[in-house]
From Swiss-Prot:
Function, as annotated: Catalyzes the formation of acetyl phosphate from acetate and ATP. Can also catalyze the reverse reaction.
Chain positions recorded as ATP binding sites: K15, H206, L207, G208, N209, G210, D281, L282, R283, G329, I330, G331, E332, N333
Signal peptide as annotated in the record: none
The protein, known as: Acetate kinase 1
GO CC, one annotated term: cytoplasm
NCBIfam families, per database record: ackA
Catalyzed chemical reaction(s): acetate + ATP = acetyl phosphate + ADP
Organism placement in taxonomy: Bacteria, Bacillati, Bacillota, Bacilli, Bacillales
Cofactors (names): Mg(2+); Mn(2+)
């Protein structure tokens, strides 16, 4: 029995999901939190039961050792030999990695070299890769990049209107993120629609604390709302999304903050938190708006307004849309936001049923049968995409 483990390593966390392949059955999943801090938390689900331990885990290598030991202790696996593939989520692949790759020493060096494009994420991703390679050196390891799916964007979509030499010399361009999620839901939408993805025009809305929209034509990403970094695009939980770049020196002058401090504000104190002054959590804002809090209502309106701008422009970009897909925490669970986004799209041929919209986290169509444009909730499954890519590369390696 072959097992593949999908890994998402953060700076102080390690999420994992173990699959039986090729059946794609989830065997177990869990997370190690607060790595390198006192009272680290190890959580694993075994036979539907969540087991939680508080234990000191000083670094990622110890976290990986512990994870593998727990898999054996809880009889999830009989020996390490059962694990035949490891897939690692890597946030930034730049232009170097247009698809998932087998990890060797050179690939690790290249991912490290791309760290200046994703200083918060890539170093953590590499730490996870190295920890697993040290303990399971002979198992096929694969890197799956958040940016890879968007590498099909044409130059007119990814170039900024800056001196062209900035792109040539420094790699300044739109990269886009959440690619694994956009790819998964676009392929799943094609299955649900019973049509080849190659003939579809899809608008995928990955709406979570981080949010991005993508225009997917013929199974390929043509454009997406995030940019050089995940700060661009729509308003998010704490991120501003697109702003006039001249605001940065203006804010510096007015507040005495450095460029780095302003960037910190744009990343961590803006978006729905910044506008509402209450919370970055959409559920809190929905509750407050229902009680008549104007600022909470305004934060939600700004979020929806920015989503509308992308839906309109991407529909024009693809000369029409066959389906709109909602995914991720907000997209899957907030009937309120879906309703606000869908209201006013009738001109595009979107006719949706309010009764069907009262659902959380399950896969379903929201449109009336006669609606030319279909509307679908598809819970994302980035871990499964990672496991599938491992399978593909394992067969070719």
């Amino acid at each position: 029995m072959e097992k593949t483990i999908a890994i998402n390593a953060g700076s102080s966390s390690l999420k994992f999901q173990l699959y039986d392949m090729p059946s794609e059955r989830v065997i177990t999943a869990g997370i190690v939190e607060r790595i390198g801090l006192k009272d680290s938390i190890f959580t694993i689900t075994v036979d539907g039961e969540k087991i939680k331990e508080i234990i000191d885990i000083p670094d990622h290598e110890i976290a990986v050792q512990m994870l593998l030991e727990k898999l054996i202790n809880h009889k999830v696996i009989g020996s390490y030999d059962e694990i035949t593939g490891i897939g690692h989520r890597v946030v930034h692949g730049g232009e170097r990695f247009p698809e998932s790759v087998y990890i060797d020493d050179q690939v690790i060096k290249d991912i490290e070299a791309l760290s200046e494009l994703a200083p918060l994420h890539n170093p953590a991703n590499v730490t996870g890769i190295k920890a697993f390679r040290k303990i399971l050196p002979d198992v096929v390891s694969v890197a799956v990049f958040d940016t890879a799916f968007h590498q099909t964007m044409p130059p007119a979509s990814y170039l900024y209107s800056l001196p062209y030499s900035y792109y040539e010399d420094y790699g300044i361009r739109k990269y886009g993120f959440h690619g694994t999620s956009h790819k998964y839901v676009s392929e799943r939408a094609a299955e649900l629609l019973g049509r080849p993805v190659e003939e579809l025009r899809l608008l995928t809305c990955h709406l979570g604390n981080g949010a991005s929209i993508a225009a997917i034509e013929g199974g390929k990403s043509m454009d997406t709302s995030m940019g050089f970094t995940p700060l661009a695009g729509v308003s998010m939980g704490t991120r501003s999304g697109n702003i006039d770049p001249a605001l940065i020196p203006f804010i510096m002058e007015k507040t005495g903050k450095t460029a780095e401090q302003v960037l910190d504000v744009l990343n961590k104190e803006s978006g729905m938190l910044g506008v509402s002054g209450i919370s970055s959590d959409l559920r809190d804002l929905e509750d407050e708006a229902a009680k008549g809090n104007d600022r909470a209502e305004l934060a939600l309106q700004v979020f929806v307004d920015r989503i509308h701008k992308y839906i309109g422009s991407y529909a024009a970009r693809m000369n029409g849309v066959d389906a709109i897909i909602f995914t991720a925490g907000i997209g899957e669970n907030s009937s309120y936001i879906r309703e606000k986004v869908l209201r006013g799209l009738e001109f595009m041929g979107v006719y949706w049923d309010p009764a069907l919209n009262q659902v959380r986290g399950e896969e379903r169509f929201l449109n009336y049968p006669h609606s030319p444009v279909k509307v679908i909730i598809i819970p994302t499954n980035e871990e499964l995409m990672i496991a599938r890519d491992v399978e593909t590369i394992k067969q070719n390696h």
